[in-house]
Amino acid sequence: MPIPTNELEEPVLAGNRRAIARLISRVEAGHSDCRRTLAKIYRNAGQAHVIGITGVPGSGKSTLVRSFVHAVRQQGRTVAVVAIDPSSPFSGGAILGDRIRMLELVNDPGVFIRSMATRGALGGLARAALDAVDILDASGFDLILI
């Protein structure tokens, strides 16, 4: 039986990776019970630096992110990456190209990478991305890259 959304608040604020991923998944899926939990979590947000990176395909975004994450980690700071990928025309999910190019970062305990599909949202930003940033901010990451 899945953990109720309201029971994810404390583990998320404690930086529990599984709870963070579950809450982001529920936000992406549009679960109606997320709003109350997000409102509580939002009170703890506002400490992270958030940087958005955009560009045409093949312009080096993933390479830049990978290099930037390495540099920030050498300073001992934690980093979360929200990789917004185009949606697959077949599944509606993320194509995951960015995540594949950043595989060496996934085993670093100071790095959290989450891919999100645009799911048809205009402007290339998934609808749940801003909520994901708030969740990651409240969970204690120093830097969040989108």
Please give the residue ranges for each predicted region.
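Nucleotide-state-sensitive switch-loop elements of NTP-binding domains
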Residues: 3-15, 21-48, 59, 65-146
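Hydrophobic anchor at the beta1->P-loop junction of P-loop NTPases
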Residues: 51-53
